[in-house]
Amino acid sequence: MKTPFGKTPGQRSRADAGHAGVSANMMKKRTSHKKHRTSVGPSKPVSQPRRNIVGCRIQHGWREGNGPVTQWKGTVLDQVPVNPSLYLIKYDGFDCVYGLELNKDDRVSALEVLPDRVATSRISDAHLADTMIGKAVEHMFETEDGSKDEWRGMVLARAPVMNTWFYITYEKDPVLYMYQLLDDYKEGDLRIMPDSNDSPPAEREPGEVVDSLVGKQVEYAKEDGSKRTGMVIHQVEAKPSVYFIKFDDDFHIYVYDLVKTS
């Protein structure tokens, strides 16, 4: 039903897909349920909106370096509490969730809050939606030659604002994606894996405080020896060892199990 990340020119290689070091001028684009990467571009600072824009539809220009200004339209999903300048955005036609400081990033221009609001829809199967959260899955994607490619991943949570969408990440490409997974499940393109290997969550005493890494600065050593810095911005409720990380030099949101990798 969809194409995988690799099959088009300009995307990052399979070797890069498992690491955080990726060029910040690439975006993953979906056209007719196909994932691609395309370059985008930065511009001049914009005046700061005075009202809360979470849940709003927005559009803005984007210009990177000396490139042309391109126009982007999307939905603001969240404002990050540990960095209120940072917004999580789902752009139209793109599968990734992007993190941008909309009012500070010089690449953003002419930010406009649109009058149309996001339509709310009733979830078709609330029990299935709850069941798949936190589960390992196999997600089938249609390649450009019509064959199927299987991607293993984890369903992280229901997405905010767009209530029939789910956050998901993949072993081959640990960034944050959004899909309407109930549709994929019903079409046979999503399979929930048995969780016999998952240990039950540890029992907590009433009032027990569990340490969280949210708000912590992190440093990532790339294979070439260089380092990149970022911040832990979210802890996944269904899998508390899994966190979202926003690196300073990239607008993708990375998803890592920091217990396994520490």
Swiss-Prot record:
Keywords tagged on the record: Acetylation, Cell cycle, Chromatin regulator, Developmental protein, DNA-binding, Isopeptide bond, Meiosis, Nucleus, Phosphoprotein, Repeat, Ubl conjugation, Wnt signaling pathway
Annotated GO MF terms: DNA binding; histone H3K4me3 reader activity; histone reader activity; methylated histone binding
The protein's name: Spindlin-1
GO biological process: gamete generation; meiotic cell cycle; positive regulation of DNA-templated transcription; positive regulation of Wnt signaling pathway; protein localization to chromatin; regulation of DNA-templated transcription; rRNA transcription; transposable element silencing by piRNA-mediated DNA methylation
Comment, domains: The 3 tudor-like domains (also named Spin/Ssty repeats) specifically recognize and bind methylated histones. H3K4me3 and H3R8me2a are recognized by tudor-like domains 2 and 1, respectively.
Location of region: Disordered: 1-49
Post-translational modification: Phosphorylated during oocyte meiotic maturation.
Classification via InterPro entries: SPIN/Ssty, SPIN/Ssty_sf
Modification sites for Phosphoserine: 109, 124, 199
Region: Histone H3K4me3 and H3R8me2a binding, residue numbers: 93-98, 142, 250-252
Family, per entry: Belongs to the SPIN/STSY family.
Major localization listed first in the record, in broad terms: nucleus
Region (Tudor-like domain 3): 213-262
Residue ranges, annotated region (Tudor-like domain 1): 53-116
Subunit organization: Homodimer; may form higher-order oligomers. Interacts with TCF7L2/TCF4; the interaction is direct. Interacts with HABP4 and SERBP1. Interacts with SPINDOC; SPINDOC stabilizes SPIN1 and enhances its association with bivalent H3K4me3K9me3 mark. Interacts with SPOCD1; promoting recruitment of PIWIL4 and SPOCD1 to transposons.
GO CC terms, sorted: chromatin; cytosol; nucleolus; nucleoplasm; nucleus; spindle
